[in-house]
């Protein structure tokens, strides 16, 4: 029997809009992205791949991550959970944060001089690392790559899991890691 195809198909070599877009993520029948308008204001939008309809779902610059049911957003002062179906949004944590990632059923976020881990409802929040200013967190399977600055050691690059076990990368390892990441 022929393979079942969705009602939409991936469009090739077709311009979908003229917006300046960042952080493009495809999830099911939607493409989610950050858009910047002429006044340099950011918003989170999604485009339906079936009818190419675009809707603004959040009116601030943010980082966002998607799982089966929710979109998790960080706007720098709070972490929010948005239902993908009805777009209902609730704050799960009021916290200044520099960056965050979603790993399985955990949210890892950096604030001030700490890296914390909490569950998807904002509970069980605990510190993974102290005395570190994380500039960048990226998911690598079940692990997280962190670029930052430690008060005791200066510039740091490491890989850690959501339990806080980490492996420091030296200069040569970092270059190799970046090459693998870009592959």
Labelled PLM ranges:
Residues 32-34, 72-73, 109-110, 145-148:
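Residue position within the beta-strands of beta-propeller blades
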Residues 92-103, 107-111, 116-117:
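Eukaryotic tandem repeat interaction scaffolds
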Residues 1-16, 39-56, 78-93, 114-130, ...:
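Surface-exposed loop/turn elements that mediate protein-protein interactions on large endomembrane-trafficking
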Residues 27, 40, 67, 75-76, ...:
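Short loop/turn segments that connect beta-strands within the blades of beta-propeller domains
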Residues 19-27, 59-68, 96-104, 132-141, ...:
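Repeated scaffold domains used in trafficking and secretory/extracellular systems
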């Amino acid at each position: 029997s022929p393979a079942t195809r969705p009602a939409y198909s991936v469009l090739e070599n077709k311009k979908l809009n003229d917006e300046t877009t960042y952080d493009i993520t495809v999830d099911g029948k939607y493409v989610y992205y950050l858009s910047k308008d002429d006044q340099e204001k950011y918003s989170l939008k999604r485009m339906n791949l079936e009818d190419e309809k675009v809707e603004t779902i959040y009116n601030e610059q943010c980082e966002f991550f998607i799982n089966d049911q929710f979109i998790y957003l960080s706007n720098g002062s709070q972490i929010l959970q948005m239902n993908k179906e009805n777009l209902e949004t609730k704050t799960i944590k009021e916290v200044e944060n520099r960056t965050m990632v979603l790993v399985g059923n955990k949210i890892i976020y950096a604030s001030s001089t700490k890296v914390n881990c909490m569950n998807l409802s904002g509970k069980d929040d605990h510190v993974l690392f102290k005395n570190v200013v994380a500039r960048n967190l990226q998911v690598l399977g079940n692990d997280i790559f962190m670029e930052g600055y430690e008060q005791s050691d200066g510039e740091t690059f490491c890989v850690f899991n959501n339990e806080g076990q980490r492996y420091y990368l030296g200069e040569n390892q970092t270059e190799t890691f970046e090459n693998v990441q870009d592959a």
